[in-house]
């Protein structure tokens, strides 16, 4: 069972989009691969907040788990709407999907520092509904989901030396692909199509990154998130 919250962090601010960014709206928190930092994506204020993780904090002591980092946050372009963040398997790069602008931002990552190196479009129709982002286990390809219009997955190759993205394809999916996951062996990609009431199963070409629908849909009422148990 979960214990009561040991601490609560509150944020202030707003963003450029008056309908979607009237206040802070944390959409994802991610501990860095080195376990030393936590990044929190704030869709409402166009920021990635940074915290230092205290490894000595435990449920039975009074040590604070999170301490404000320096800088306290990283700002992205106004109206972007940062949603989900993921790290490359080598831990050297991070990638952010922006819900409102439909872009992916690539960062170099080193000991808590994010350095923006590229912005590339995942959504090219202005749907303002980009959703999830994941990298293949081999670190060669990145996938980003889009909803509301042209529902599907943008597919990018990742340059092995500098982490830069190149778009290599687009896979149309069922309606509202809110979340997806790549199987641990990298062979398949499962998409939670919320408004189609199915989890679609795609075979993944490990050489090209492209996807093939193998027509083995799993019927589920309003699927929104898929996780594998270690």
Regions found by a protein language model. Give the residues of each.
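Short loop/turn segments immediately following beta-strands, especially the blade-tip
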Residues: 1-3, 52-65, 107-114, 156-163, ...
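Beta-rich catalytic cores
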Residues: 25, 81, 129, 176, ...
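Short loop/turn segments immediately following the C-termini of beta-strands
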Residues: 43-44, 53, 99-100, 109, ...
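Surface loop/turn motifs at the tips and blade-to-blade linkers of beta-strand repeat domains
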Residues: 10, 19-23, 73-78, 121-125, ...
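Asp-box/WD-like beta-propeller blade repeats and closely related beta-sheet repeat scaffolds
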Residues: 1-28
């Amino acid at each position: 069972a979960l214990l009561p919250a040991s601490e609560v962090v509150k944020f202030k601010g707003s963003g450029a989009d008056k309908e979607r960014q009237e206040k802070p709206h944390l959409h994802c928190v991610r501990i860095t691969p080195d376990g030393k930092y936590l990044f929190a994506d704030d869709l409402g204020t166009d920021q990635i907040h940074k915290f230092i993780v205290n490894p000595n904090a435990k449920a039975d002591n009074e040590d604070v788990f999170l301490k404000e980092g320096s800088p306290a946050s990283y700002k992205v372009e106004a109206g972007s709407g940062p949603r989900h963040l993921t790290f490359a398997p080598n831990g050297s790069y991070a990638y952010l999907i922006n819900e409102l602008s439909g872009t992916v931002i690539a960062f170099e990552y080193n000991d808590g520092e994010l350095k923006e190196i590229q912005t590339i479009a995942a959504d090219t129709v202005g749907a303002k509904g980009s959703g999830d982002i994941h990298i293949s286990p081999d670190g060669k390809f990145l996938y980003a989901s889009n909803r509301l219009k042209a529902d599907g997955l943008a597919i990018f190759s990742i340059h092995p030396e500098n982490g830069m993205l190149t778009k290599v394809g687009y896979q149309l999916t069922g309606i509202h692909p809110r979340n997806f996951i790549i199987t641990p062996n990298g062979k398949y990609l499962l998409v939670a199509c919320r408004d189609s009431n199915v989890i679609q199963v795609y075979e993944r070409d490990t050489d090209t990154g492209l996807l093939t629908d193998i027509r083995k849909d799993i019927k589920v009422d309003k699927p929104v998130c898929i996780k594998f148990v270690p």
